[in-house]
Amino acid sequence: MFSKFFSLQKAFAAARRRLLILILVLGMAGYAWGPALAARQIPPVALSPTESITFTEAQLARGKQLFNRACAQCHVGGQTYPNPDVTLKLSDLEGATPPRDNVLAIVDYIKNPVTYDGVESLVEYHPNTQLLSEYPRLRNLTDEDLKLIAGYILVQAKTVPGWGGTKSESHSDLSAYL
């Protein structure tokens, strides 16, 4: 009887050791893979009509910082306060003439803004890199800075619910934009 009891006790001890080893291995794997699994999946965006690009978290953070400094006065949450009918949501960017749904097209617009239908130049009116006296925030931005801003806009348009939507949609969670 005692030998049976000790055999069961040994079996339980072995099972307990195996369980502890399994828990330890899974815990270490979770610790090692956790940050990668928790990281936001950044979708690729169009660099041009024929090429795509995937920005890193660091690039998007810099793009966000530049956007907030140079663009957010009029484009909080992807809206356009002077003209709420034309926003920074993807469907509006796609519908412009020429389409502004890629990084290089947004960079071109920031440098040489035109009306939504592409007919008239807005260089004299809309903030841009050429309008030196009226809007200095864009003045010293490099092409790389402009690409980061454009990437931030496009990733937001793809991933943030309400980006460029109505006031209640866009402002339901301001933490996504700040």
From Swiss-Prot:
One of its GO terms (molecular function) is metal ion binding. It is found in: Cellular thylakoid membrane. Gene3D superfamilies: Cytochrome c-like domain (1.10.760.10). The keyword S-adenosyl-L-methionine does not apply. Its cofactor is heme c. Keywords: Electron transport, Heme, Iron, Membrane, Metal-binding, Photosynthesis, Photosystem II, Signal, Thylakoid, Transport. The keyword NADP does not apply. Its main location: membrane. PROSITE patterns: CYTC. GO terms for cellular component: photosystem II; plasma membrane-derived thylakoid membrane. Binds 1 heme c group covalently per subunit. It comes from the Bacteria. Residues 1-38 form the signal peptide. InterPro entries: Cyt_c-like_dom (IPR009056), Cyt_c-like_dom_sf (IPR036909), Cytochrom_C550 (IPR029490), PsbV_cyt_c550 (IPR017851). It is a peripheral membrane protein. One of the extrinsic, lumenal subunits of photosystem II (PSII). PSII is a light-driven water plastoquinone oxidoreductase, using light energy to abstract electrons from H(2)O, generating a proton gradient subsequently used for ATP formation. The extrinsic proteins stabilize the structure of photosystem II oxygen-evolving complex (OEC), the ion environment of oxygen evolution and protect the OEC against heat-induced inactivation. Low-potential cytochrome c that plays a role in the OEC of PSII. Belongs to the cytochrome c family. PsbV subfamily. This is Photosystem II extrinsic protein V. It comes from Synechococcus sp. (strain JA-3-3Ab).
